[in-house]
């Protein structure tokens, strides 16, 4: 599966680029799970994931405020839930690297594909209705 087959455009170059970066991190996690990596290598990718996802959510929430998106509070709660889910996996599976990478990969892929298709598409629809008439 390629990035362009599944990810919608947010009409925002920064957010679109970040979605692509998160997709690349997801690919790294998937490969790490197949290769049975050590904790040192995993920590590097986990750090990259947490930094990128927090930055992306912050930027996306700023975009929603900028366009006056009426459901920003709901969307922000979903973001917090995703972050908590990732953190919970890291804590609960710290001793089992392969299980951790597998679970994280599923959460990240779910976020990238399902969240963008379902939730982010609502932002896109609102943006297009409000600004692209």
UniProtKB/Swiss-Prot annotation:
Keywords (A to Z) from UniProt: Iron, Metal-binding, Oxygen transport, Transport
Keyword Amino-acid biosynthesis: no
Spans traversing the lipid bilayer: none
Record-level Gene Ontology MF annotations: iron ion binding; oxygen carrier activity
Positions with a binding annotation for Fe cation 1: 19, 56, 60, 120
CDD domains reported in the protein's UniProt record: Hemerythrin
PROSITE patterns referenced in this protein's UniProt entry, alphabetically: HEMERYTHRINS
Subunit architecture: Monomer.
Protein role: Oxygen-binding protein. May be involved in a storage mechanism or for delivery to oxygen-requiring enzymes. The oxygen-binding site contains two iron atoms.
UniProt record similarity statement: Belongs to the hemerythrin family.
Protein name: Bacteriohemerythrin
């Amino acid at each position: 599966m390629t990035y362009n087959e599944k990810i919608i455009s947010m009409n925002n170059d920064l957010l679109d680029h970040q979605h692509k970066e998160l997709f690349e991190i997801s690919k790294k996690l998937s490969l790490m799970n197949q290769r049975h990596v050590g904790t040192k290598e995993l920590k590097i990718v986990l750090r990259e994931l947490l930094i990128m996802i927090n930055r992306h959510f912050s930027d996306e929430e700023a975009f929603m405020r900028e366009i006056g998106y009426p459901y920003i509070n709901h969307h922000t709660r979903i973001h917090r839930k995703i972050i908590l889910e990732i953190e919970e996996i890291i804590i609960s599976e710290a001793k089992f690297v392969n299980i951790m990478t597998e679970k994280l990969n599923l959460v990240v892929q779910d976020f990238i594909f399902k969240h963008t298709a379902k939730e982010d598409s609502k932002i896109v629809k609102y943006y297009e209705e409000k600004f692209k008439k």
